[in-house]
Amino acid sequence: MSEVNEMSGGSIGGELLRASPKVLTAGDRKLLKVELRPGDTTYVSWKKLMRDAGKVNGLSASVPDPPPNANPNLEFRIAPGHPVEIETNEQPHSNRFNAVIEKIERLYKGNDSSDGEELDGAPDDDEYDTEDSFIDDAELDEYFEVDNSTVKHDGFYVNRGKLERMEPSTTSNQQPKKRRRKDSAKPCRDAVDVSDKHTKLSITARKKDQSTAPGSWKTQESPLPSGAQDANTSVPLDDVKHSDRANHQSRNDTSHKSRETGSSSALHQKYSNKSLHQQSTSLLGKSPPNVFAEVTVVRQKENNGMHQLANVTGSRQSSQASKKDGSNVKSKTSILEKAIRELEKVVVESRPPAITENQEADTSSQAVKRRLPRDVKLKLAKVARIAQASQGKHSTELINRLMSIVGHLIQLRSLKRNLKIMIDMGDSATREKDTRFKQINNEVLDMIKAKVSLMESQAIKPEGATSDDFQDSVEKPSLKKFVMDAALEDKLCDLYDIFIDGLDEDQGPQTKKLYVNLAELWPNRLMDYRGIKHAIFRAKERRKALYGNLAKEMDQTKMKKSMKQLVPRTDCTAQPNTELVVQRQHSGEKKLIVDPNATSTSVVTSQTMVDRSNQQQPEKLKGISSSCNPTEETRVVKRKNEAVMAEKQVVLALKKPEHPQTRVIPAPQNLNIPRTTPDLNLPS
């Protein structure tokens, strides 16, 4: 049974049909005749049908029609049979290019087209069994290997054969395109492949480390001679060769041995990195020889038997330079660790123990302006100074550690700002100390010159002495020891304090150098370092005694002030007695002096006045003793005085018209009022 299928350019994709179709043309349309077989499913592809029809019909079907607007003169010159020959000669040329294109497509896309319509050449699970252990998968694995090495030539190219690469192949048996296998079980060869994969990975990791290490190694060991470089680089190269041999032998072993070689390669890598780090630190720790040359030059400076200023200050600067260069026996790291531990101790002591975690969270959330305690600030400045001297800058690790210590007191940006300020202040302080040190040293030199000249003048031959006595007197200054006064000892003590203030560690050897340098300021070896040491100790003892006396005097003045403040409170009960005396003096301002010629009535009135005043005194005493407040006492006294004066005025007004001969004379305030009653037995 056969049918004619009419199609206008559409396509139905599917399996290829073996029978060649017949092409029938009708105007612009093409008719293809396809044979249909009963019992089979027929898949028709338009492209495949057109290709097969072109092959069957031959070259005549592909002959192009002449263009409608061709040149008539050109057609007139060409014979009528010639165009067919030319066209037939040109057709194989076009077919040749088509064949090349199809070949390239088959090479890169497979044997068939990549439109997904034809699947004749696609492998199926039924055709290739990946589980079969008898089939050798070496070629398949090689095809799916991924090579990560760099190619020697760049650009677009078509190469036949194996590509040239910069490094030996470090491929790993990765198979991204291969289909997954149904079962996870693998034969013995797969285990060997996995071991090879581990070894290759370890080799690539080690080669990467080696590729990065030589650059840094060259930069670090540039100041060393070539012999030292060869000696140092021979160790890691031997390690690399040894690890390569071990990895090469492990390819023929089991997976367990391959794991052991991988661990050994990791150990070799750690060892090589450690050796590089140690050699770099040893190179950084070396100091240039210029420092020692400066020290020797400074010690040789003399002027007329007396060392100048550079002798003392040079030793101090050389010691600081040696510390900066790392030539100390103790490293700066240990000093820095010690300073950080001291800071932790001070922070723990200054931190109040009653603060809980919740309270800390509340205070940290609030924008409270916090200030560092003075002790914490001093220790932090010491840490900043040591870190600047040893590292040259403050590393992130150091700042994080300081924040873990003082983070509850200060923020991160404030800590960085304070560290910078402390370093700047430390530099300015060191400059000020150096200038002050030089100034005091010059003063000491002047004092020594004056003292030595005085000693020489005293040692000169006195009047009337012989020549032998003169020779003895000349030799006396060399035998006589120099005696210091208190002012010179104080100056030396000031030099000692300034010198010690800048030292962090190893004060013993440095102070001894200071003693020796100061002793060399005296001519003819009149002073040794022990004398300098004893003089400084004597000055310190005097200062301690002076400070102790001042402290005692200040304590005594404080005690006196406190006693004066406590006197009004303690003498509150005794105050009424003094007030009582004053009251008595005021009450007795006016004393009645009785005339012997007066009558008895005036005497009686004066007696009554005295009795009334005597009765008022206990009342005043009761009022004063009841209240210790001075303001209340003055108010009560004023009121009672006013009442007494009013009574006196009334009595005097009554007595004036009756007895004009009596006189009232005011008594002075200093006189005491007699407590005894007057004698009433007057003469008749």
Curated annotation (Swiss-Prot):
Residues 157-167, 184-199, 238-260 have a biased composition (Basic and acidic residues). It is found in: Nucleus; Nucleus, Nucleolus. The keyword Nucleus applies. One of its GO terms (cellular component) is nucleolus. It holds the Pfam family HUN. GO terms for biological process: negative regulation of gene expression, epigenetic; nucleosome organization; response to salt stress. Its main location: nucleus. Keywords: Chromatin regulator, Nucleus. May be required for replication-independent chromatin assembly. This is Ubinuclein-1. It comes from Arabidopsis thaliana.
